[in-house]
């Protein structure tokens, strides 16, 4: 620029524009990844709807539940069949709500039947009005159920809230009630899991952070978003140079399964952060990629984990395709190798209620019908 006077006059303006742009970016409404904006496939009518199941009773009691590892030693790796049954029985209404919400939202996004939407919103509104899952009387298993349920519900709800079909446009009152409940529950989840000592920060904290991330987008709360990012950083900074998580290695024969279980919430948080201008991929020298690669290598050769912690690995959980749903967000964050892509395609579609339903439809819609048996 030749005119020094003009340059001087423009300088503050350019600075102001830069500040404004930064502020605008910070103030931009939080959003989910692009796949969550998908419209409803078809709006069907007629009597082929599956109807609305009986609503599970809103759970308002103390969140005091028996652990399925009750009686196990510090490793928490040996299943107690009796206490697992007691846990399943006492939490049945909660998991029915989680599974039912994910299922109905998937059905509605496919078929667009108003009764599917009404059923989902009626369930969530009733639980919200009952102030369910908000008890301050809880044990570790109880606060774990709270954050799992919140993550399931909020991530399913996001598909309704952001769909280009705008299904909530005629349901603003219910939406406000539901979002206020999610918001309040997320505050409690933050309180439940914040600032734990590192030796107690494990996959539970990552799942708590995922529930708060999903809620931050559902309710447009930047403070919740920031907390989820903070917890993500704590989590991936626990990944060592070889891609192991020391606290999950303690799980003895279930160490590999728990490394795999740590990946879905971390990959989802990174994916949601990415579309909101926060790139977490390189945190701790690409720790998320390192962890994912270590797990995939461990699935091929479990001896890697046995050599590390001295225990032969229990592969039961890892025979279920849906346990690898984290590959959907992971392979959008990083470039997955052709053999990993082939593995992913062989397992699709990935449907898991704890992440809000059908992740293949969100992240890789061209493969939503799956390739099993082809």
Curated annotation (Swiss-Prot):
SUPFAM superfamilies: Chondroitin AC/alginate lyase. Gene3D superfamilies: Chondroitin AC/alginate lyase. The keyword Lyase applies. Residues 1-26 form the signal peptide. Substrate binds at residues 67-68, 140-141, 258. Its main location: periplasm. It is an enzyme of class 4 (lyase). Its EC number is 4.2.2.3. CDD domains: AlgLyase. One of its GO terms (biological process) is alginic acid catabolic process. Disulfide bonds: none annotated. InterPro entries: Alginate_lyase (IPR022859), Alginate_lyase_dom (IPR008397), Chondroitin_lyas (IPR008929). It is found in: Periplasm. GO terms for cellular component: periplasmic space. One of its GO terms (molecular function) is poly(beta-D-mannuronate) lyase activity. Keywords: Lyase, Periplasm, Signal. Belongs to the polysaccharide lyase 5 family. This is Alginate lyase.
């Amino acid at each position: 620029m030749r005119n020094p006077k003009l340059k001087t006059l423009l300088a503050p303006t350019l600075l102001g524009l830069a500040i404004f742009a930064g502020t605008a970016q910070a103030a931009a409404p939080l959003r989910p990844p692009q796949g969550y904006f998908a419209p409803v496939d078809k709006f069907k009518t007629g009597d082929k709807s599956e109807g609305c199941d009986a609503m599970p009773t809103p759970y308002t009691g103390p969140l005091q539940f028996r652990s399925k590892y009750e009686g196990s030693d510090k490793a928490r790796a040996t299943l107690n069949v009796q206490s697992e049954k007691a846990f399943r029985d006492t939490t049945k209404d909660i998991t029915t709500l989680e599974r039912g919400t994910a299922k109905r939202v998937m059905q509605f996004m496919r078929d667009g039947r108003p009764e599917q939407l009404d059923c989902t919103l009626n369930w969530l509104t009733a639980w919200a009005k009952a102030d369910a899952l908000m008890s301050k009387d809880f044990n570790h298993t109880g606060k774990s159920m709270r954050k799992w349920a919140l993550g399931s519900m909020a991530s399913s709800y996001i598909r309704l809230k952001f769909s280009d079909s705008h299904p909530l446009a005629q349901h603003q009152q219910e939406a406000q009630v539901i979002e206020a409940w999610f918001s309040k529950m997320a505050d409690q989840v933050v309180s439940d899991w914040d600032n734990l000592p590192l030796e107690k920060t494990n996959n539970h904290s990552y799942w708590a952070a995922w529930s708060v991330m999903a809620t931050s987008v559902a309710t447009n709360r930047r403070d919740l978003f920031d907390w989820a990012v903070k917890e993500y950083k704590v989590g991936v900074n626990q990944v060592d140079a070889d891609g192991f998580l020391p606290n999950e290695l303690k799980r003895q024969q279930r160490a590999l399964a728990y490394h795999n279980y740590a990946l879905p919430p971390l990959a989802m948080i990174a994916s949601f952060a990415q579309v909101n201008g926060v790139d977490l991929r390189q945190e701790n020298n690409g720790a998320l990629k390192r962890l994912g690669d270590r797990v995939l290598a461990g699935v091929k050769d479990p001896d890697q984990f046995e050599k590390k912690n001295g225990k032969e690995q229990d592969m039961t959980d890892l025979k279920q395709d849906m346990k690898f749903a984290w590959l959907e967000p992971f392979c959008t964050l990083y470039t997955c190798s052709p053999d990993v892509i082939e593995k992913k395609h062989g397992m699709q579609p990935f449907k898991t209620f704890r992440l809000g339903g059908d992740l293949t439809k969100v992240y890789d819609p061209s493969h939503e019908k799956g390739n099993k048996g082809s």
